[in-house]
Design a protein with these regions (language model features):
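Histidine (H) residue identity feature
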Residues: 5, 34, 71-73, 99, ...
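Generic preference for well-ordered alpha-helical elements
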Residues: 2-6, 55, 72-76, 90-93
């Protein structure tokens, strides 16, 4: 369901930014309670709760060995821009192609 999906997104990307949350509250007030995502609810299944709790932060999902630290930071930065909650703030294709991740020298990647 949509509420569960938003809860999963918060687990992976962090809390909804205040400005976006306020916008979302005007369209879907039933998803929020006292300024925060209203999840879990009393009727939320244990399966849903476990599934959402199993979500990892983005930087852990794309974890990499220390040899890739510079690349990892740039890659996570790019992903965060691509996955921005607010579509109006998401990186454009042109901006994505200019992102520092794509400026890395391929020869800098460990074998």
């Amino acid at each position: 369901d949509n509420l569960e999906h938003l809860a999963m997104m918060e687990m992976v990307l962090g809390k909804l930014p205040d400005d976006y949350r306020r916008k979302a509250e005007t369209y879907k007030p039933e998803y929020f309670y006292h300024g925060r995502l209203d999840y879990p609810r009393p009727d939320t299944s244990k399966q849903s709760r476990r599934f959402v709790q199993s979500m990892k932060p983005l930087q852990d999902i794309v974890a990499s060995p220390p040899a890739y630290a510079k690349h990892h930071h740039a890659f996570v930065s790019l992903l965060r821009r691509l996955l921005e909650f607010d579509p109006a703030k998401r990186i454009t294709v042109e901006e994505a192609l200019s992102h520092p991740y794509f400026q890395l020298d391929p020869h800098d990647f460990p074998p």
